[in-house]
């Protein structure tokens, strides 16, 4: 492996005059290798030993979450529509770059986290207990629960993650305000999910 690696290095350097960074070049297992924000993991499919699929590196996920945190920080003076607009720009730009990676399951977790952050912003925006009570009533909560929920002593994040807001500020209601999940947009742009049917392997559905 080292001999082949050196031959490739010399070929690229001498024949094509390409600059090669020795520190970033090396011989290593795919699972220990990242490049341009991508990593590799085994496919774990029967009959596919030695095959790997492309995923997003930990640094790539960290960068995305940091940008989302900035936009959805409850103290940032954005209107809800402004947050949604900026959130779309960040999510779509990130997914356009990483669309070739296999990340569907991970996106589901991130989507849930993003929605809770949006609920947190909404709860913070309502501020006073009486305003919260009236808004909960508008969302279909009964009189008794709207009063007790609006005066909950739980923290903002705890309320956002609880049934108080998860059953009232639903995914459908967020979508009506312009929200689009990472998973839905990924399913639109991921090339291996949008190939013509005749190019895909036929699978038996049971």
Walk through the language-model features, giving the residues of each.
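Non-catalytic terminal/accessory segments
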Residues: 1-206
């Amino acid at each position: 492996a080292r001999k082949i690696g050196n031959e490739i290095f010399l070929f690229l350097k001498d024949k094509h005059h390409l600059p090669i960074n020795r520190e970033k070049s090396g011989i290593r297992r795919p699972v220990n290798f990242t490049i341009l924000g991508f990593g590799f993991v085994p496919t774990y499919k029967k009959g596919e030993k030695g095959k790997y699929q492309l995923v997003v590196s930990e640094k790539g996920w960290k960068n995305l979450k940091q940008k989302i945190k900035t936009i959805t920080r409850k103290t940032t003076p954005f209107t809800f529509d402004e947050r949604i607009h900026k959130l779309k720009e960040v999510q779509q730009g990130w997914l356009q770059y990483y669309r070739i990676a296999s990340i569907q399951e991970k996106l589901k977790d991130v989507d849930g986290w993003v929605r809770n952050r949006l609920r947190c912003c909404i709860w913070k925006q309502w501020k006073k207990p009486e305003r919260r009570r009236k808004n909960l009533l508008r969302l279909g909560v009964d009189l008794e629960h709207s009063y007790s929920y609006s005066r909950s002593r739980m923290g903002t994040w705890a309320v956002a993650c609880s049934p108080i807001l998860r059953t009232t500020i639903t995914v459908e209601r967020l979508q009506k305000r312009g929200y689009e999940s990472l998973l839905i947009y990924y399913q639109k742009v991921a090339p291996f999910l949008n190939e013509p049917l005749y190019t895909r392997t036929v699978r038996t559905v049971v």
